[in-house]
Amino acid sequence: MSRRGTAEEKTAKSDPIYRNRLVNMLVNRILKHGKKSLAYQIIYRALKKIQQKTETNPLSVLRQAIRGVTPDIAVKARRVGGSTHQVPIEIGSTQGKALAIRWLLGASRKRPGRNMAFKLSSELVDAAKGNGDAIRKKEETHRMAEANRAFAHFR
């Protein structure tokens, strides 16, 4: 056992305009080459586009999208006796949100379209409605976990 103290878990800071932690998590994941101001710009433009499209609060759409994409269970590769098994594991809320954000950004990057703000807003609206690539990814993960349920005892 380690003699060092355990690191305290950092709480996510909230962004300056919406005062929301999810927005800040999204900004930190979309960030490339340390250009945080550009990341904020993209997110705020996307949220503005969501406001125009749906005529509802963009934060509620964002929350709904992330809630819809957050997985409850995932599979983890584990080597047992020379063969690798996909072992289903439960996911905590923080890790689930992080995965959901990663999937949403990945799906929006793959989308055809003009700019990232437009693609992200479209993906978030789709995810909030219950369709889109990120939702498909979640369902695929759940299917994998269900198919490999027999290996759950390898945890």
Swiss-Prot record:
The gene is rps7-A. InterPro entries: Ribosomal_uS7, Ribosomal_uS7_bac/org-type, Ribosomal_uS7_CS, Ribosomal_uS7_dom, Ribosomal_uS7_dom_sf. One of its GO terms (biological process) is ribosomal small subunit assembly. Keywords: Chloroplast, Plastid, Ribonucleoprotein, Ribosomal protein, RNA-binding, rRNA-binding. The keyword Lyase does not apply. GO terms for cellular component: chloroplast; ribosome; small ribosomal subunit. Part of the 30S ribosomal subunit. NCBIfam families: rpsG_bact. One of the primary rRNA binding proteins, it binds directly to 16S rRNA where it nucleates assembly of the head domain of the 30S subunit. It is found in: Plastid, Chloroplast. This is Small ribosomal subunit protein uS7cz/uS7cy. It holds the Pfam family Ribosomal_S7. Signal peptide: none annotated.
